[in-house]
């Protein structure tokens, strides 16, 4: 499939052939969902922790005698039934990450690219270059109508462009190896350079 290539100033710069296996799939929400869950679960710190009845700072002495008070039978003040007592089966420090095969992760990335293509939210640009001035780049981005965009460059990111883009709200740039399903789906517009297209095709073949 062919898609027009533009420059940062909006001028046309020819066209590019996109691989059907990467950009022409019928997007499946279940595949995208599984990959996004895998990404977000692996990113979760898992540092949540509450104290059990053996860890709270209370005496383990029985609070009153067993019989003869007319009240319910109780043991230590640290029991979960009391305010300030331990928590029964509360969260512990653990990893939320789970395994997902490399083949499935690649498939998810192909479906994410295809989803952007199908939605008309994919833009191919000739290259990313800048004089390092944030104001000039922000004006170009505004003229192109990119409000929340992710730019995928080639194997390495143009450092001058990255510096200029750093303070533009809603604009992010990643190298090809950093391209992932979550970041692609989170943005309204996916922008890929010609070098990025070639690198993605080499990575996902």
UniProtKB/Swiss-Prot annotation:
Transmembrane segments: none annotated. GO terms for biological process: translation. Pfam families: Ribosomal_L4. Keywords: Ribonucleoprotein, Ribosomal protein, RNA-binding, rRNA-binding. The keyword ATP-binding does not apply. GO terms for molecular function: rRNA binding; structural constituent of ribosome. The keyword rRNA-binding applies. GO terms for cellular component: ribonucleoprotein complex; ribosome. It comes from the Bacteria. Belongs to the universal ribosomal protein uL4 family. Part of the 50S ribosomal subunit. One of the primary rRNA binding proteins, this protein initially binds near the 5'-end of the 23S rRNA. It is important during the early stages of 50S assembly. It makes multiple contacts with different domains of the 23S rRNA in the assembled 50S subunit and ribosome. This is Large ribosomal subunit protein uL4. It comes from Roseobacter denitrificans (strain ATCC 33942 / OCh 114) (Erythrobacter sp. (strain OCh 114)). The gene is rplD.
């Amino acid at each position: 499939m062919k898609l027009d290539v533009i420059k940062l100033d909006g001028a046309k710069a020819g066209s590019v052939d996109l691989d059907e296996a990467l950009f022409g799939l019928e997007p499946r929400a279940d595949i995208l969902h599984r990959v996004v869950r895998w990404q977000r679960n692996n990113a979760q710190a898992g540092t949540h922790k509450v104290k059990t009845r053996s860890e709270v700072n209370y005496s383990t002495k029985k609070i009153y005698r067993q019989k003869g008070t007319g009240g319910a039978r109780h043991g230590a003040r640290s029991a979960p039934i009391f305010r300030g007592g331990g928590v029964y089966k509360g969260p512990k420090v653990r990893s939320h990450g789970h395994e997902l095969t490399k083949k499935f992760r690649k498939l998810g990335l192909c479906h994410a690219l295809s989803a952007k293509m199908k939605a008309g939210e994919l833009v191919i640009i000739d290259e990313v270059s800048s004089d390092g001035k944030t104001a000039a780049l922000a004006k170009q981005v505004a003229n192109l109508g990119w409000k929340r965009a992710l730019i995928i460059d080639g194997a390495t990111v143009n450092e001058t462009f990255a510096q200029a883009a750093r303070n533009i709200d809603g604009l992010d740039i990643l190298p090809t190896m950093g391209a992932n399903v979550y970041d692609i789906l989170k943005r309204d517009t996916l922008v890929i350079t010609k070098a990025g297209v070639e690198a993605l095709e080499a990575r996902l073949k």
